[in-house]
């Protein structure tokens, strides 16, 4: 053990043994952590050796000793020491301390001298002392070692990154070469597939021609209408009427049309024949009427082609309620699309006159006479929305509604999402908010979840509410005015619009959501419906009730025999939906626990009070619509898109 003593000015008095171990530091490879720009370490210890233990003992000068030294009364014990204690086989230790930490008298003497000589340098001296102590406590060699180690690690990391990137680049180049080879193979296969398709199309054409030639009692296949005309009864007037049109396409010596056109013509001919072969011969008028509709599809102008196809499809589907409608009253205001109906109905009226000579012609007035032609006894070949087996399931009533299944969270609090139940695809249509002029289309549910829309329809007007539906390729909605509108999504134009006869609108434009849409469209197994409030003459206290009416999808007309007034009061329910001709109403839209509380049956005209639990998962349901194709409810609840599964009592 070594000790260093610094004597001071001589003074009388005994020497007490005063040892103050203020700091104990154990030596290691490096010294203890020092505080930079903080409190200065009073003792600095350094150690060297593989087996070393060091300890520093500091005995500073007390304040009383300083005062005695200053007054000239110093004692023998007035001194300060720094002792070093070491142990170990291989150890070298050293302890040092700055004079300012051991002898506070020095600082006091310096401060007094500064105050006397240069008072303005007092602040500078204090800063110098602070910097001196800070530099003394810093281990610059240790900082340098850390910086060097960090730099070496950065170099190692840089080299590894370069090596990894080079390997990844090689993988990418190899993948690109592999993909280019696969692309070449795919192009070769594509050429082979195109040649195979051409061969198959030519074989299909030959088979169709052979089938057409093998039909007993049929002339050679010369056009798309020859087979249908023979099946319809072979009347001379009818065949002469369309024979010239057919000869202009095939019989004359014109260049042969492409194979695709021949395939379409043969397919039309085959479909026309299929639509007529199963019909009994005792009903030639109904067959002739259907035949006239098909010819109308074939020979109409291109501008109205899709419109005519939709109307012809409705006629072919054989919806019973459309055929039972009475003749239209002549005093009714003309609808905006009356010219389109005249154009589409012209060929039917003329051909019906040809097939029934005993009936006097009515000139330009087109009055439908559904009682003149018998109804088909067989079920329709193309049902309107569901399969034929689903009509039987409509005999039951609603038994329970399952809790909702959330599919996505999209858009604002209010909105509507829907599918076209008459379409074969899985497109989803969304109207975000309760008024606007946009309809967003998504290819399927997966694209909707990813936010990848495939089409956006900018309507030339503003819609309002959330009671819209998409049905048979058209968007049915209420405009910002009082009109209900059919917007054709294929041709992107307003196909028809109308005013409901007895509807009661709100007093002012609803600039906030009021719980439900005043005009709500619905689609079930029987077709298109509209739900709206109307005046009730039976009760003056509550004059407004909910009316349920079946709509004509073509011209949006309503009829008295397909209109029912319910006892459901306006603003007394949350949302409503229609299933199998039965109207159901949910009692609340902004409470989580709700009930299907009301039902009205259009088949019997009776209503009932129910208590079927209905869960508004997020307590803000702005749309509930039934999809007859999937037999589920589509709902928009506070920006969440949900579906409900239904259970019925058969």
Swiss-Prot record:
<keyword id="KW-0964">Secreted</keyword>
<dbReference type="InterPro" id="IPR003112">
    <property type="entry name" value="Olfac-like_dom"/>
</dbReference>
<feature type="compositionally biased region" description="Basic and acidic residues">
    <location>
        <begin position="329"/>
        <end position="345"/>
    </location>
</feature>
<comment type="subunit">
    <text>Homodimer. Binds to heparin and chondroitin sulfate E.</text>
</comment>
<keyword id="KW-0732">Signal</keyword>
<feature type="compositionally biased region" description="Pro residues">
    <location>
        <begin position="371"/>
        <end position="386"/>
    </location>
</feature>
<feature type="compositionally biased region" description="Low complexity">
    <location>
        <begin position="357"/>
        <end position="370"/>
    </location>
</feature>
<feature type="compositionally biased region" description="Basic and acidic residues">
    <location>
        <begin position="249"/>
        <end position="274"/>
    </location>
</feature>
<feature type="region of interest" description="Disordered">
    <location>
        <begin position="318"/>
        <end position="406"/>
    </location>
</feature>
<feature type="site" description="Cleavage">
    <location>
        <begin position="300"/>
        <end position="301"/>
    </location>
</feature>
<keyword id="KW-0175">Coiled coil</keyword>
<feature type="domain" description="Olfactomedin-like">
    <location>
        <begin position="393"/>
        <end position="650"/>
    </location>
</feature>
<dbReference type="GO" id="GO:0007165">
    <property type="term" value="P:signal transduction"/>
</dbReference>
<feature type="disulfide bond">
    <location>
        <begin position="394"/>
        <end position="580"/>
    </location>
</feature>
<feature type="signal peptide">
    <location>
        <begin position="1"/>
        <end position="32"/>
    </location>
</feature>
<dbReference type="GO" id="GO:0005615">
    <property type="term" value="C:extracellular space"/>
</dbReference>
<feature type="region of interest" description="Disordered">
    <location>
        <begin position="214"/>
        <end position="289"/>
    </location>
</feature>
<feature type="coiled-coil region">
    <location>
        <begin position="163"/>
        <end position="188"/>
    </location>
</feature>
<protein>
    <recommendedName>
        <fullName>Olfactomedin-like protein 2A</fullName>
    </recommendedName>
</protein>
<dbReference type="Pfam" id="PF02191">
    <property type="entry name" value="OLF"/>
</dbReference>
<keyword id="KW-0325">Glycoprotein</keyword>
<dbReference type="InterPro" id="IPR050605">
    <property type="entry name" value="Olfactomedin-like_domain"/>
</dbReference>
<keyword id="KW-1015">Disulfide bond</keyword>
């Amino acid at each position: 053990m070594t000790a260093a003593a610094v004597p001071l000015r001589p003074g009388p008095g005994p020497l007490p043994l005063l040892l103050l171990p203020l700091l104990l530091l154990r030596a290691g490879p490096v010294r203890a952590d020092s505080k930079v720009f903080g409190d200065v370490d009073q003792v600095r210890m350094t150690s060297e050796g593989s087996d070393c233990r060091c300890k520093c003992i500091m005995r500073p000068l007390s304040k009383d000793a300083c005062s005695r030294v200053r007054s000239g009364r110093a004692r023998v014990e007035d001194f300060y020491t720094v002792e070093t204690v070491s142990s170990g086989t291989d150890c070298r230790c050293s302890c040092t301390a700055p004079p300012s930490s051991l002898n506070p008298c020095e600082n006091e003497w310096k401060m007094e001298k500064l105050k006397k000589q240069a008072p303005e340098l007092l602040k500078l001296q204090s800063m110098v002392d602070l910097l001196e102590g800070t530099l003394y406590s810093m281990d610059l060699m240790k900082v340098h070692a850390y910086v060097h180690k960090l730099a070496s690690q950065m170099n190692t990391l840089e080299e590894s990154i370069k090596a990894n990137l080079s390997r990844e680049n090689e993988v990418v180049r190899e993948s690109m070469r592999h993909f280019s080879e696969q692309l070449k193979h795919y192009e070769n296969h594509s050429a082979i597939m195109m040649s195979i398709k051409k061969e198959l199309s030519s074989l299909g054409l030959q088979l169709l021609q052979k089938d057409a030639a093998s039909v007993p009692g049929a002339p050679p296949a010369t056009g798309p209408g020859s087979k249908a005309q023979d099946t319809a009864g072979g009347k001379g007037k009818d065949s002469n009427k369309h024979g010239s049109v057919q000869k202009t396409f095939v019989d004359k010596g014109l260049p042969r049309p492409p194979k695709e056109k021949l395939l379409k013509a043969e397919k039309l001919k085959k479909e026309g024949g299929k639509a007529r072969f199963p019909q009994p011969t005792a009903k030639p008028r109904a067959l002739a009427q259907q035949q006239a509709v098909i010819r109308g599809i074939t020979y109409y102008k291109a501008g109205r082609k899709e419109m005519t196809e939709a109307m012809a499809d409705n006629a072919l589907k054989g919806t019973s309620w459309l055929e039972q409608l009475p003749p239209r009253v002549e005093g009714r205001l003309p609808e905006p699309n009356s010219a389109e109906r005249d154009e589409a109905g012209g060929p039917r009226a003329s051909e019906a006159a040809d097939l029934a000579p005993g009936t006097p012609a009515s000139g330009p007035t087109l009055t439908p006479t559904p009682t003149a032609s018998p109804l088909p006894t067989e079920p329709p070949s193309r049902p309107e929305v569901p399969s034929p087996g689903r009509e039987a399931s409509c005999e039951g009533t609603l038994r329970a509604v399952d809790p909702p299944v959330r599919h996505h969270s999209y858009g604002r609090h209010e909105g509507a999402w829907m599918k076209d139940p008459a379409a074969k695809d899985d497109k989803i249509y969304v109207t975000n908010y309760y008024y606007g002029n946009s309809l967003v289309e998504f290819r399927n549910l997966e694209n909707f979840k990813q936010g990848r829309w495939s089409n956006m329809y900018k309507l030339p007007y503003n819609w309002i509410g959330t009671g819209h539906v998409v049905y048979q390729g058209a968007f049915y909605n209420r405009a910002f005015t009082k009109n209900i509108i059919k917007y054709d999504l294929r041709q992107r134009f307003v196909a028809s619009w109308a005013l409901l006869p007895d509807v009661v609108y709100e007093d002012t434009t609803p600039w906030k959501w009021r719980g439900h849409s005043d005009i709500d469209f619905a689609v079930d197994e029987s077709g298109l419906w509209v739900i709206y409030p109307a005046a009730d003459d039976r009760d003056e206290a509550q004059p407004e009730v909910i009316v349920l009416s079946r709509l004509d999808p073509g011209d949006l007309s309503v009829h008295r025999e397909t209109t029912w007034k319910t006892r459901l009061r306006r603003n007394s329910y949350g949302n409503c939906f229609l299933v199998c001709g039965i109207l159901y109403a949910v009692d609340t839209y902004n409470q989580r626990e709700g009930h299907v509380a009301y039902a009205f049956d259009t088949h019997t005209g009776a209503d009932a009070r129910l208590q079927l639990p209905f869960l508004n998962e997020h307590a803000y349901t702005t749309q509930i619509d039934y999809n007859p194709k999937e037999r589920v409810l589509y709902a928009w609840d506070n920006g969440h898109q949900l579906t409900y599964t239904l259970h019925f009592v058969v």
